Amino acid sequence: MGIIVLKNEGLNFHARISTPLSEIDYDIQKELLDLTKKVKVAGFRVGKVPISIVKKKYGISIRNDIIEKRINNLVNHVIKEYNLNIIGRPKIEELQNEPDKALEFTVKIELLPKITIPDLKKISLDRPKLAVNSKDVEAQLEKLAALTKCYTKESKTKIKDGDQVTIDAIGYIKDRAFDEGKLNDFKVIIGSNTLIPGFEQQLIGSKTGSKVDVNVTFPENYHARNLSGKDAHFVVQIKAVHTAEPTVIDEEFAKKFQSNSLEELRTHFAKQIENESEEAINTIMKMNLFDKLEKLLDFDVPESLLEQEKNILKSETDKNKHDGSLLNGKSSKEIIEYYNKLALRRVRIGLLLAEYAKFKNLQLEPDDLKKVIMQQARNFPGQENMIFDFYKNNPRAIEGLRGPALEDKTVQYIFNNEIQLKEKRYSKEELEKYLETEEQQRISLI
């Protein structure tokens, strides 16, 4: 075996590797002899097949297998011999594989950088904390009361905002009735915007028993494409009108929601309000930590990881370019600079966190993955069960969450055990303003 190192600098190791023809021939001959003992060929007993016939039938495939195994073994030997901390698969180039010549090839290996973990205890950050007050809690109770109103009192007066109206309706487009426009005994709360924009408002002022002509235009983004953007006329029959009975927020009200007392329900809502802010706070905290880390890191990163991250960024941008992307209106040069800067930041921080997790022996538990799946589900309101089923039935998709899950766990460990955190309390309005300001400042950096 011969090894000539062509390049060993930075994160690149290139070498020319060779092995004598005699060793290749020996391995091939040994494999052929072993095969003669068990191969079945018509006209010969097992174990009595001439090696020439076995070679003619299986020689090429055996040689290919031997060459592949030999290359893998030689590359692994080089990695071990030079103590290389590799990333990705080594590239095999300039392969010389003629039957009458020595095996030679060039291997190109990309290396992981040597990472020195900075002193994280020197980092200090403010940690926003929502100070929930009674006003916030009472507002949530009022919302709950509004959602659980009882419409038992029939009204003979004119329809007003907030009334529950029972209707029959037939819809027409260009004087032709369409199936999707037919409603029977349909109940709608006026002002809830359940129906097409403008529909409910045109019922205000009518009474039970009256017929109302309603003219609307289906939104351009309406889910039924055959109706989107079209003008429609509805003939609506008002069958009943009910007003809401006042909801009293008392001990009995609390018991309807599995609370032993009104005070317990208030405590539940206070905790819920606090939890709702945690995800946004954690996201900002994570970005602020990454801002600090970015200034401390200056090691080179593997080119393959950098290109991979740039491609991910480009894919994300292309996917969102019609949704008011932050890069809309930017020149090609500005976009490339943005990709380069953000990709370098992501890769450096990702490698640091991976090294830190390894150093601290941080391991993923089932609950860590469940937490990330819950976060994914919250991004799709109303479709949570579909998201849960997707990950339940797709183990490979769960594997794709292991990286983000370990990153989140590592960041939380750093928050809890390393950096200096100073809690800063905000009211609900102050916190919303703070989070909005932080987001705008981050956008302005692009």
Swiss-Prot record:
GO molecular function annotations of the record: peptidyl-prolyl cis-trans isomerase activity; protein folding chaperone; ribosome binding
Catalytic activity: [protein]-peptidylproline (omega=180) = [protein]-peptidylproline (omega=0)
Gene3D superfamilies, alphabetized: 3.10.50.40, Trigger factor ribosome-binding domain, Trigger factor, C-terminal domain
Keyword Repeat assigned: no
Localization of this protein: Cytoplasm
Keyword annotations: Cell cycle, Cell division, Chaperone, Cytoplasm, Isomerase, Rotamase
Residue span, PPIase FKBP-type domain: 162-247
SS bond partners: none
GO cellular component terms listed in the entry, alphabetical order: cytoplasm
Function: Involved in protein export. Acts as a chaperone by maintaining the newly synthesized protein in an open conformation. Functions as a peptidyl-prolyl cis-trans isomerase.
Protein name stated in the entry: Trigger factor
Gene: tig
